[in-house]
């Protein structure tokens, strides 16, 4: 999908405009061997998405995108330009049936954003994000846009002020809930207003239980940046639960002097911020040689972002985690071996589980150096009774009983070689699954495996 969008009001994507529609259970692109792309430039107002340019009172659910995205900028200044994997522009109308919902979406595609001649940093700027570009509502509507349980793994390379893992700008009446960003962002723009979940929360916008694990690396001058959000911009705004675990890097001074923080850059106007984890780290870019702040349990509130003494009482129950928090999940062959050993011994598996208790792959796993594989859930059947159409089996030892999400990644060069001398012994990547779910996993490959 490649286009030069000339003129006003252009939309572009697999779908241009969704109006009262539903798109679900769709995968676009693939981890490898796929040449899909979304690349466009604009000369006027434009909204583009891999799935849809504009989502108007519609639902996009349970979809995955691997498609790399690149907006080359807008040749006209002060013209809204949006790009994201699922909806460039998200809009709710005046009726209850005109609500837009994005849920259970995963983006793996890289995100590259350039400004062109558009130098603005507000609603009429260039926006790029993993899930949606900008959300808004009809001026007479009181209904809410919803982005729920969405994840971005796409790496972000940006030269514009507004780029985020989930939603570049929650302009009005939007709830972002249970979303996670794992993508890192390197941004060279001056005067950024970057947040890794969203850049701004406006009127009647709430963020609930959202987590950022990506690093925000701002290389330009006067770059405002927050681990979750840059600007809280309305007295109705709420941020509850979740937290930041990524680095926040910019040459701008850290709070309280400047607009940079583990949670937000600027706590300007809001109703409450409660029960949020202030993890990760804060530092100056310093030409690439980071100079990190020393953040402790005694001073961590000084580094969550800039807020006034009048607003301090609305910021409650902030939880300090410090830096170097490891992203939970399986990232290497050794991680997979260790996870199997933990399941088989009955030990804790929390090091490989996300906040929902799901065991997740963080990337492709190459098992070429593992000569012998011991299954996850290495139990064996101890007896069975068969009669008629009934069969009752019993096993002893370990079984995997949880949820394993491959996140679309693959396990390759897995050598499953066994001598099953004991009767009714189970063998595979998993030995015995008991009440478990295994999903979104590729084993092997067409070539090189």
Enumerate the language-model features and the residues they cover.
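Surface-exposed repetitive/solenoidal architectures
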Residues: 1-449
């Amino acid at each position: 999908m490649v286009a030069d969008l000339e003129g006003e009001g252009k939309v572009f994507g697999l779908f241009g405009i969704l109006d009262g529609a539903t798109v679900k259970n769709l995968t676009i692109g693939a981890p490898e061997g796929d040449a899909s792309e979304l690349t466009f430039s604009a000369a006027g107002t434009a909204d583009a998405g891999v799935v849809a340019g504009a989502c108007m009172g519609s639902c996009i659910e349970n979809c995955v995108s691997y498609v790399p995205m690149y907006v080359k900028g807008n040749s006209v200044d002060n013209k809204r330009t949006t790009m994201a994997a699922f909806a460039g522009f998200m809009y709710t109308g005046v009726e209850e049936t005109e609500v837009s919902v994005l849920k259970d979406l995963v983006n793996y595609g890289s995100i590259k954003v350039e400004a062109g001649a558009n130098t603005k940093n507000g609603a009429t700027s260039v926006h790029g994000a993993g899930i949606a570009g900008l959300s808004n509502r009809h001026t007479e509507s009181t209904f809410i846009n919803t982005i729920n349980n969405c994840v971005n793994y796409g790496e972000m390379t940006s030269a514009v002020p507004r780029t985020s893992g989930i939603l570049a700008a929650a302009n009005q009446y939007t709830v972002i809930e249970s979303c996670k960003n794992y993508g890192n962002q390197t941004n060279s723009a001056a005067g950024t207003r970057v947040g890794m979940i969203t850049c701004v929360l406006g009127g009647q916008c709430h963020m609930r239980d959202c987590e950022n694990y990506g690093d925000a690396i701002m290389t330009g001058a006067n770059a405002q940046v927050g681990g979750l959000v840059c600007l809280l911009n309305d007295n109705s705004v709420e941020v509850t639960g979740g937290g930041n675990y990524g680095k926040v890097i910019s040459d701008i001074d850290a709070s309280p002097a400047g607009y940079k923080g583990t949670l937000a850059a600027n706590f300007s106007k809001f109703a409450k911020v409660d029960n949020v984890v202030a993890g990760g780290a804060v530092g100056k870019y310093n030409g690439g040689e980071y100079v990190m702040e020393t953040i402790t349990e005694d001073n961590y509130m000084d580094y969550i972002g800039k807020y006034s003494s009048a607003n301090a009482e609305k910021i409650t129950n902030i939880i300090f985690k410090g830096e170097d928090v490891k992203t939970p999940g399986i990232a290497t062959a050794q991680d997979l071996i260790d996870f199997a050993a933990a399941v088989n011994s009955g030990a804790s598996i929390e090091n490989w589980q996300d906040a929902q208790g799901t065991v997740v792959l963080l990337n492709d796993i190459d098992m070429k150096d593992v000569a012998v594989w011991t299954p996850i859930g290495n139990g064996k059947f101890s007896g069975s009774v068969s009669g008629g159409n009934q069969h009752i089996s019993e096993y002893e030892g370990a079984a995997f009983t949880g949820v394993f999400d491959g996140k679309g990644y693959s396990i390759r060069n897995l050598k499953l070689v066994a001598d099953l001398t004991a009767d009714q012994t189970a063998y595979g990547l998993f030995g015995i699954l008991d009440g478990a779910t295994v999903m979104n996993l590729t084993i092997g490959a067409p070539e090189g495996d």
